[in-house]
Amino acid sequence: MSEHSVPQIDGPRHEPAGGGPAEQLIVLLHGLGADGNDLIQLAPMLARAFPEAAFVSPHAHQDCDVAPVGLQWFSFKGESDQVMIQGAEQAAPVVDTFLDQELERQGLTADKLAVVGFSQGGMMALHCGLRRAQPPACLVGFSTLLPGPEKLDAEIKSKPPVLLTHGDQDQIIPAHAMPQTEAALKAAGVPAESETRPGLGHGIDERCLELASDFLSRHLAG
């Protein structure tokens, strides 16, 4: 995918409360079958700790091919490990270009960037965030996994701290994916922490948001 052929994406925004320049950039990547309007709903809650942050939740660039509505970062047809890593690799230029453009738009450096993703969006947050030449401040993955963990050692460029949360009743991405992802991250030298949420399915609950807010507060520079 050449630079000129990379699809341009955008989505809903939540601007800094004070109306001035953003002090941080928090990018929210939605899951399969949703769009940016889904995760931008997290912005008002996270903005309590980051009133001067700019939030943006871009719409993925592909129509979902396994549901009648919504979007996808890549096709999940086949649901194999190979499908996931190839899909993440193909979508990475779209996400990386967007992150670069948003940092430039806000006049911010990478250490003021956090990438937060749910499910397939979390896969993209991890895949891209660990391969960026300029490391983001941190990454958050809700109900997700790391595509192609066996490729990480050879391709990793950044080691930002990572938070993972996962419901133990998740029927979409099994809960055992989280400790596997955490182990792969730590083996590559990435600081990672996690919490399993009892009774939670494939989703984000209030505790997940509390954990994310605390994690971002510790790692995202003001």
Positions of the model-derived regions?
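Serine-hydrolase catalytic machinery in alpha/beta-hydrolase-like enzymes
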Residues: 2-108, 112
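Short beta-strand immediately N-terminal to the catalytic nucleophile in serine-hydrolase-like folds
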Residues: 115-117, 142
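Hydrolases whose catalytic domains are alpha/beta-hydrolase-1, hotdog thioesterase
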Residues: 124-128, 150
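A conserved short beta-strand
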Residues: 134-146
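Short beta-strand/loop motif that positions the catalytic acidic residue
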Residues: 164-166, 170
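Conserved alpha/beta-hydrolase "acid-adjacent" motif
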Residues: 171-177
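C-terminal catalytic histidine-bearing segment of alpha/beta-hydrolase fold enzymes
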Residues: 179-222
